[in-house]
Amino acid sequence: MIALIQRVSQAKVNVKGETIGKIGKGLLVLLGVEKEDNREKADKLAEKVLNYRIFSDENDKMNLNVQQAQGELLIVSQFTLAADTQKGLRPSFSKGAPPALANELYEYFIQKCAEKLPVSTGQFAADMQVSLTNDGPVTFWLNV
C-alpha cells in the first residue's frame, strides 16, 4: 500500500465541477492499493500517516505530526501509484489491486484515519481534479 503525502495549507478535490472534499492545513494523501495489500497493511500505513512528523514545531524543526499540528486529511484514491514503470514508455498496472479490493481497503483506510482526525475524501474510481497549496513544498512517498 502506497501513500504519497503532501503537507498543504489547503487542498480540495472536485468531481464534475463540484467540490466534494476540502481541507485547510493538513495532509493531502494520495492512496494507491496493490494486489497484495490487506487490512494489516492499511493499519500500518494509517498509523504512519497519522504520526509522521513533518510539521514544524516552535523551533521551525519538522517535529510534529498532523494530529499535533491540529491538521486535517484529504484522502484521494490514486491507482496510478501502483504502476510499474520499469519497462518501456507505458506504465503497467498489473501490480494494482482489483477495484473491489482497492475500494474496500480505501474505505477501511479512511475509517481508521477518521478515528483520529477530521477527514475529507475524493470519490473512488472517479475522474477527479485535485488542487492544493503544497506547504514547503513537503512531499513524502510512504510504502508499507
From Swiss-Prot:
Domain notes: A Gly-cisPro motif from one monomer fits into the active site of the other monomer to allow specific chiral rejection of L-amino acids.
PANTHER family: D-AMINOACYL-TRNA DEACYLASE 1, D-TYROSYL-TRNA TYR DEACYLASE
Gene Ontology terms for molecular function: D-tyrosyl-tRNA(Tyr) deacylase activity; Gly-tRNA(Ala) deacylase activity; Ser(Gly)-tRNA(Ala) hydrolase activity; tRNA binding
EC number(s) recorded for this UniProt protein: 3.1.1.96
EC class name: hydrolase
GO cellular component: cytoplasm
Assembly: Homodimer.
Location of this chain's protein in the cell: Cytoplasm
Protein's GO biological process: D-amino acid catabolic process
NCBIfam families, per database record: D-aminoacyl-tRNA deacylase
Function statement: An aminoacyl-tRNA editing enzyme that deacylates mischarged D-aminoacyl-tRNAs. Also deacylates mischarged glycyl-tRNA(Ala), protecting cells against glycine mischarging by AlaRS. Acts via tRNA-based rather than protein-based catalysis; rejects L-amino acids rather than detecting D-amino acids in the active site. By recycling D-aminoacyl-tRNA to D-amino acids and free tRNA molecules, this enzyme counteracts the toxicity associated with the formation of D-aminoacyl-tRNA entities in vivo and helps enforce protein L-homochirality.
Main localization, broad class: cytoplasm
Species assigned in the record: Haemophilus influenzae (strain PittGG)
Assigned protein family: Belongs to the DTD family.
Keywords attached to this entry: Cytoplasm, Hydrolase, RNA-binding, tRNA-binding
Motif Gly-cisPro motif, important for rejection of L-amino acids boundaries: 136-137
Catalysed conversion reaction: glycyl-tRNA(Ala) + H2O = tRNA(Ala) + glycine + H(+); a D-aminoacyl-tRNA + H2O = a tRNA + a D-alpha-amino acid + H(+)
KW Aminoacyl-tRNA synthetase (keyword) present: no
SS bond list: none
Name of protein: D-aminoacyl-tRNA deacylase
